[in-house]
Amino acid sequence: MCIRDRIIRLCLAHKDIAWKSVEAPVITPKPDLSVLTGGYERIPVMQIGADIYCDTDIITAALEAHTPEPSLYPAPLGSAGKMIALWAANSWFMNSAGAALGANPDIVPEEFWEDRGRRFGMKRETFLPAVPHMQAQFHGAAQLLKDALADGRPYIAGDAPGHADFALLVNIRFVQFAGILPNIFGDAVADWHDRLGAIGEGDREAWTADAAIDHARATAPVGGHSVADGKGFEAGQTVSVKTESPDPAKVTGTLVGLDDRTIVLAREHERCGEVHVHFPRLGQILTPA
């Protein structure tokens, strides 16, 4: 299980959505996953029929649209909670990785370092010397969390948990690999950690990759997308999407949806038939293919 997919598990449990889990390899290649995504190999990926959602940001948006209540963005923060979640899942997450893995780099095999170096630029020889800085940055960010909870609020937004809490929690859990336990940050953080942990991961059923692929083939994408004017692309154009990271993987398909929030590509594979692959606009490089 990827540490990042815990965010989505918590979202599903919070919304009381029954879901199916397909295990994917930690290290590339991931051939069955690529059948559905077209080459995107990061975790998590969510499938609803023949619609495939790549990246936590677009998955949470899809879950919020599918089951609006209880919201992942409770008042009074509302959508500002997404900005906190994006910070927690990107800037703070990398420092959490330093705090978690740097203290004991042998906890993961050499194949892991090779894979992460190729895909994310996370090379052992440059990562490990930066560990002291990342550890300091992790604790600095943890202090922000501690300060936010110091007024007695049960969750970041107040009385209800949401995406921001789940993304922040992943970092506190990640560093437990290095023996950094929640109580180190004080009672407010430890209690917050325990409240979120009690949410669990919902109604989960294990599924095979073949079952997921067959399910996509037996359904059709929902559709109804459009390409907004003034974005530099046209509906029906062949395009490629890749992340802003060093990861060379690209997904190529027919552009069917584009706005300031999302990118949607239509593509086909003999095993899954036609699927629509969804990406967030943030963090993705869109180019003509």
List PLM regions with ranges.
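GST-like domain detector, emphasizing the conserved glutathione-binding G-site
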Residues: R4-D115, F233, T243, T252, ...
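GST-like fold's C-terminal all-alpha helical module
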Residues: A88-A198
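Short gly/pro-enriched beta-turn/loop segments at secondary-structure junctions
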Residues: P161-H163, F233-G236
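Histidine- and/or cysteine-centered catalytic micro-motif in compact active-site loops
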Residues: N171, A209, E244
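Mixed-charge, Lys/Arg-rich low-complexity intrinsically disordered regions
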Residues: E201-A235
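A short beta-strand micro-motif
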Residues: T238-E244
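Phosphate-binding active sites in nucleotide-utilizing proteins
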Residues: D247
